[in-house]
């Protein structure tokens, strides 16, 4: 007789791939214009918010408006095309820096010239950075003084280094050398058609954490990232309801896809203000929430736990926060409850590794109730305009369902 433990193990019903076992979202599809370059998609609504804050420096309070961000990315794109950088379609640049306005400008400037950006943690080891540069084929690195000594020495000037903060021999300075090299009348990008743009070109090349081996480059195209942004913030009933009136906290590293996609790209798409923290600090984060009346706080479970256990929350007015997103790892209900006691006016949504609604059988991240019910042990409903298949790794066939 089988033991109780054995009886409780799920059994996959495996079939060869067929249309019947491709699961479509129960939510209606939305129109997605995913043939645009990523920068055009994210900046599409900028004329409506041109004079509003786009990037707010959490350390200094300095503000760049949407019009200024658009102008500066155009200017930097013009500089990337010129000597000595000479970048174009198919080139790869590396963003090796902590959160900053320069990170955003360099990312979208690369998109404008048809290049891809590989993002890297400046706290990585020299060996890890060298491997990523070699594997990705990056020829230009945007970085900061603290990380420049970690870069490999390439013969014949094969690697151009651009520093965003201090000056150093052998390196270009972001503002004084690169941006200043472009005359005021030459900061317009050419038409993508003339540059041979294709929506299936790679625009972002973040690296995995290496949980199944060495870190691997993840090739993300203009089409795939535009689609991802649309599935989060577009449509009449967006899954993550960011608006142009929101102020979004960016305390998570932009070199990670969560911050890069959900905070930076989605925030820019809707015209929200983004408060940029160079790196996370709990006390500083709460000060910024109070000072800038932050409404959206994308976090990760360790930060959620830190807030839940902190007495500092009582010393700050956090009432402006209406939505908290937690991603990268799941959380238990006890942690959620302890955290929400500190922010009773906010909605908490857990963002999963696959596109899905924030919490099953509960309000999603927009604060709306889902019209569909599902088990609490499930990961929720998947996004609109999305199809899902379950794969049995042992057979490489798709599973039609699970029997318990």
Per-region residue spans from a language model:
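Gly/Ser/Thr-rich phosphate-binding loop
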Residues: 269-272, 294-299, 308-371, 380, ...
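ANL superfamily adenylate-forming
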Residues: 19, 24-25, 140, 146-199, ...
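Conserved AMP-binding/adenylation subdomain of ANL enzymes
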Residues: 226-247, 255-296, 310
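N-lobe entry segment of adenylate-forming
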Residues: 1-83, 113, 193
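Conserved AMP-binding/adenylate-forming
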Residues: 58-63, 79-126
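Conserved adenylate-forming
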Residues: 83-88, 182-201, 205-250, 270-272
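ATP-dependent adenylate-forming carboxylate-activation enzymes
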Residues: 97-98, 115-133, 145-148, 272-292, ...
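Structural core segment of the AMP-binding/adenylate-forming
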Residues: 2-11, 105, 112-181
